[in-house]
């Protein structure tokens, strides 16, 4: 019997990143989703194309050997698929993990295979698999929790690939940048060994990869979007053509780089090269990436462990500089009432209805004693007062 992977989430990252590399590694991919149209499209089309875009041109891969199940209407089928799978991955958004955990827990519990299934969450969040693992344990009966690890192994991952907004008529096909990084911790697999997926870079310690990626790629991307939006830019590449915005992005990245170099075994030179590569990637006009797409979901992006407060709080704790990160936070706070983005409307409501102190705690998760709190509070007040 061939290798089988269950991929929760049939969106652009699920199809254009995770499934592409599972397919190339020889897995049959079973997509699981709750969106009727997505499941039907995957069921009705036996292939789709992933086009990698770079300055050198385009390269297209055809993805085949997949199926799709609607977990809303066919939960028992999903349970059976997980019971006989080699790998379970997901790309659903960190806030959806709690909703997919119950069916994954049932699928793991139904396993009789001697080899445990590998569970890898592919989300833009630190410790996403740990989070999913916690929810799965909550949905596993107490007498089965101890033997859970005979049936499943859980490994955190760091993913990095820019997926721009897709053309409205693209269907299942995905345009995506050529560059990617997919790092997964190998220690949880112990003597059993990790799955055979050549695209994955298996590492002993994932934290440096996750923080370097989140605090460089995601921080710079969002900083560009928020400054770009404030200055009326439509595309990320256009925003970075503006020398002032580019300079502001580099100042933010100097601060996050100082944290990465101080905290992890990464040299200044290596981080400088990484920053150069990242800014070049997000400047790529061929990606046709919109400012509003990159800036969407500001509440999540302003949260405690995310791309701004995450590094700024650690810099504050170390007594290091974080002024430029606060400029980026201010721009994120100004990303309000953007059409099609519910979080930007909710952000506007929070800032309109709550006192600055309450809004700061609500948005960032910082407590009043934290050394970063006063600096964020100052920016919240400034935005609430409507001063530029």
Curated annotation (Swiss-Prot):
Role this protein plays: Catalyzes the NAD(H)-dependent interconversion of D-fructose 6-phosphate and D-mannitol 1-phosphate in the mannitol metabolic pathway. Has a strong preference for NADH over NADPH. Required for protection of conidiospores against exogenous stresses such as high temperatures and an oxidative environment.
Binding annotation for NAD(+): 5-16
Keywords, in A-Z order: NAD, Oxidoreductase
Name assigned to this protein: Mannitol-1-phosphate 5-dehydrogenase
Swiss-Prot/TrEMBL induction comment: Strongly induced at the onset of sporulation.
One Pfam family of this chain: Mannitol_dh_C
NCBIfam families, alphabetized: PRK02318.1-3, PRK02318.2-5
Family: Belongs to the mannitol dehydrogenase family.
């Amino acid at each position: 019997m061939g290798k089988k992977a269950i991929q929760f989430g049939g969106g652009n990252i699920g199809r254009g990143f995770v499934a592409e590399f599972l397919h190339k590694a020889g897995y049959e991919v079973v997509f699981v989703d709750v969106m009727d149209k997505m499941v039907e499209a995957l069921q009705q089309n036996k292939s789709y194309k992933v086009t990698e875009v770079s300055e050198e041109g385009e390269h297209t891969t055809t993805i085949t050997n997949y199926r799709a199940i609607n977990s809303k209407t066919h939960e028992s089928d999903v349970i059976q698929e997980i019971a006989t799978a080699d790998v379970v991955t997901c790309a659903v958004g960190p806030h959806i993990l709690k909703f997919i955990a119950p069916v994954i827990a049932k699928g793991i519990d139904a396993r009789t295979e001697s080899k445990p299934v590998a569970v890898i969450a592919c989300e833009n969040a630190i410790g996403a698999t740990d989070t999913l693992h916690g929810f799965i344990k909550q949905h596993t009966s107490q007498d089965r929790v101890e033997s859970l690890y005979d049936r499943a192994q859980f490994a955190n991952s760091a993913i990095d690939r820019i997926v721009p907004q897709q053309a409205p008529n693209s269907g299942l096909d995905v345009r995506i940048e050529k560059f990617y990084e997919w790092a997964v911790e190998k220690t949880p697999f112990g003597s059993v060994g990790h799955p055979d997926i050549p695209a994955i870079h298996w590492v002993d310690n994932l934290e440096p990869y996750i923080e370097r990626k989140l605090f460089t790629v995601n921080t710079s991307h969002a900083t560009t979007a928020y400054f770009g939006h404030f200055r009326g830019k439509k595309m990320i590449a256009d925003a970075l053509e503006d020398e002032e915005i580019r300079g502001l992005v580099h100042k933010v990245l100097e601060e996050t780089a100082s944290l990465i170099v101080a905290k992890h075994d990464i040299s200044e030179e290596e981080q400088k090269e990484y920053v150069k590569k990242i800014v070049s990637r997000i400047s790529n006009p061929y990606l046709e990436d919109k400012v509003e797409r990159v800036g969407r979901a500001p509440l999540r992006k302003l949260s405690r462990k995310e791309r701004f407060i995450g590094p700024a709080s650690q810099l504050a704790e170390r007594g290091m500089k974080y002024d430029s990160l606060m400029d980026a936070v201010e721009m994120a706070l100004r990303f309000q009432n953007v059409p099609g983005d519910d979080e930007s409307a909710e952000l506007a409501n929070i800032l309109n209805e709550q006192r600055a102190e309450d809004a700061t705690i609500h948005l960032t998760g910082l407590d009043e004693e934290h050394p970063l709190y006063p600096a964020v509070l100052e920016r919240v007040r400034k935005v609430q007062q409507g001063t530029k």
